[in-house]
């Protein structure tokens, strides 16, 4: 509801100085997801694109150092998350957030609250691979890769390099690549909290709820029930998105 969008945000970097390291990682990747989803959203525009791209570049430059204790970078990240928020408050989001919203508490009875920022970090590379089957979205992801200086000649190469970069960033922040390996305090684990049989049992309902999430409407590629289930499986097993 745009009626509750704030007119003013007080961005005080002192508030971020005592953040626990894991919170720095999760909120940072949440901000990266906000910016990337805003840039490829069907509601993107000339006013949101610069905010999204600049936020992405700041996060690329500053998040890992902020995670490792650099307070100047922590201050910069505080600004980056605000810019990303300004972008998505106007351009909206996509199915990374739809999936994160619906999986967050879905396995709480197994002690597995999937923290929102960690969920976004795990799902973002998979959703990029899914959305990039849409040519308009692929071009937008290529723009992001170019702005980040990742290289690549073809659009396919640029998308692959963007996905690889985000996965390396997750490694640097000690965020797992998939739900199966989502362990204590969201750290990677050989066997995570969510049993495979429980995930598969709840998958159809989670997928249906994700499709109905408000963020799905502005995603560049609209998933079917079957596609959403397959995509969530890729996020559980860390398998390739080839559909």
Feature map (PLM): residue ranges:
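A glycine/threonine-rich phosphate-anchoring loop and its flanking beta-alpha core
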Residues: 1-44, 139-143
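Short glycine/threonine-rich catalytic loop with a Thr-x-Gly-x-Asp
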Residues: 24-29, 48-52, 112-115
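Short alpha-helical scaffolding segments that buttress acidic/His motifs in well-ordered protein cores
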Residues: 32-36, 77-85, 99, 124, ...
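Glycine-rich phosphate/diphosphate-binding loops and the adjacent beta-loop-alpha structural elements
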Residues: 38-90, 94, 104-109
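Conserved phosphate/anionic-ligand binding catalytic regions in large, soluble enzymes, centered on
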Residues: 89-101, 112-122
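Gly/Pro-rich interdomain helix-loop hinge
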Residues: 106-198, 241
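Short, amphipathic C-terminal "tail helix"
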Residues: 193-243
């Amino acid at each position: 509801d745009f009626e509750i969008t704030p007119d003013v945000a007080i961005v005080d970097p002192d508030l971020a100085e005592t953040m626990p390291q894991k919170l720095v990682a999760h909120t940072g990747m949440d901000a990266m997801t906000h910016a990337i989803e805003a840039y490829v959203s069907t509601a993107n525009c000339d006013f949101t694109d610069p905010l999204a791209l600049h936020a992405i570049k700041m996060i690329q430059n500053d998040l890992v150092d902020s995670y490792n204790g650099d307070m100047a970078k922590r201050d910069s990240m505080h600004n980056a998350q605000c810019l990303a928020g300004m972008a998505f408050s106007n351009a909206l989001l996509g199915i990374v957030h739809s999936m994160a919203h619906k999986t967050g508490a879905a396995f709480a009875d197994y002690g597995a609250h999937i923290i929102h920022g960690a969920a976004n970090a795990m799902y973002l590379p998979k959703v990029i691979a899914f959305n990039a089957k849409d040519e308009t979205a692929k071009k937008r992801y290529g723009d992001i890769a170019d702005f980040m200086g990742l290289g690549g000649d073809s659009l396919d190469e640029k998308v692959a390099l963007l996905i690889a970069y985000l996965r390396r960033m997750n490694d640097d922040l000690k965020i797992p690549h998939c739900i199966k390996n989502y362990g204590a305090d969201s750290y990677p684990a050989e066997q995570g909290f969510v049993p495979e049989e429980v995930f598969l049992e709840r998958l159809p309902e989670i997928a249906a709820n994700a499709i109905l999430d408000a963020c799905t409407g502005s995603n560049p590629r609209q998933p079917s029930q079957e596609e959403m289930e397959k995509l969530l499986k890729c996020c559980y097993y860390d398998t390739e998105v080839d559909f």
